[in-house]
C-alpha cells in the first residue's frame, strides 16, 4: 500500500521524534512508499541531558525498524537559529539525489514556534513542481487545526508504532509519551463511529495526481 499514491515522501520535523510521533503508523502501513525523514535540529532549548549523537542514534534506531524509511538529522542546536533560506538550501543541497512527489511538514496551527517555522519550508520546496503538500499532526497541534485525511491503523501497525516511540528513550518522561496520551492522540470520534479505532491525522494542503 502507498501513502496517498506517493512513491517517495519527504517528512520534515523540527526535532527528533516529531515525524515519528505523527507518522510511524503510516510508515508501518504504507510499505510501498519510501519515506525520507529530515530532522532540522537536535532538540529543544530545555533538554541539556542529551547530545546531537544521542538524539541522532534514537532516530536511527527507529528508522531501522522500517525497510522503507531513511533519514537525515541536521547538526544544528535549534531551528530558531537557522534562517529560512539556509534551511531550504540545506534540504535542496543534501537531498538533491531524491525526487519527492510528496512533502509532509508540521502544521502551521501549532503551539510550538519551531514547528511553525518548519511549516514555512513546505510551500518553498513545492514552488517549482507539482508536489503534494501535507501537514501531519503533532502533540502540540492546536485544537482548531482540522485534518482532512486519516490513515486508519490496524492493531499490528499501532503496536509497531508504540514500539518505535519507546526507542526515544530520552523522552519517555515527557507527558506526551505517557501511554494514555499516546492512545488519546490516535482517537478521533468521527472515525470511531466508522469503525476506525486508531488513526493518524493529516491535512492535505495541496494535492496533485501522480
What are these regions (language model features)?
Residues 1-135, 190-194:
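Active-site beta-strand->loop->alpha-helix modules in alpha/beta enzyme cores, enriched
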Residues 1-2, 64-68, 98, 102, ...:
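The feature marks non-catalytic terminal segments
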Amino acid at each position: 500500500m502507498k501513502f496517498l499514491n506517493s512513491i517517495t515522501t519527504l517528512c520534515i520535523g523540527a526535532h527528533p521524534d516529531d515525524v515519528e510521533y505523527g507518522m510511524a503508523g503510516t510508515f508501518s502501513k504504507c510499505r510501498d512508499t519510501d519515506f525520507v525523514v529530515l530532522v532540522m535540529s537536535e532538540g529543544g532549548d530545555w533538554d541539556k541531558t542529551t547530545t546531537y549523537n544521542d538524539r541522532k542514534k534514537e532516530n536511527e534506531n527507529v528508522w531501522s525498524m522500517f525497510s522503507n524509511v531513511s533519514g537525515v538529522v541536521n547538526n544544528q542546536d535549534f531551528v530558531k537559529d537557522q534562517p529560512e533560506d539556509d534551511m531550504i538550501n540545506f534540504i535542496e543541497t543534501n537531498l538533491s539525489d531524491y525526487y519527492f512527489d510528496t512533502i509532509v511538514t508540521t502544521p502551521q496551527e501549532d503551539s510550538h514556534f519551531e514547528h511553525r517555522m518548519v511549516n514555512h519550508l513546505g510551500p518553498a520546496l513545492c514552488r517549482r513542481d507539482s508536489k503534494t503538500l501535507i501537514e501531519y499532526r503533532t502533540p502540540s497541534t492546536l485544537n482548531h487545526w482540522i485534518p482532512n485525511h486519516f490513515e486508519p491503523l490496524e492493531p499490528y501497525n499501532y503496536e509497531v508504532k508504540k514500539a518505535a516511540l519507546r526507542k526515544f528513550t530520552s523522552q519517555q518522561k515527557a507527558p506526551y509519551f505517557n501511554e494514555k496520551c499516546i492512545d488519546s492522540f490516535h482517537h478521533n470520534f468521527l472515525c470511531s463511529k466508522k469503525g476506525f479505532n486508531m488513526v493518524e491525522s493529516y491535512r492535505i494542503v495541496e494535492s496533485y495526481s501522480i
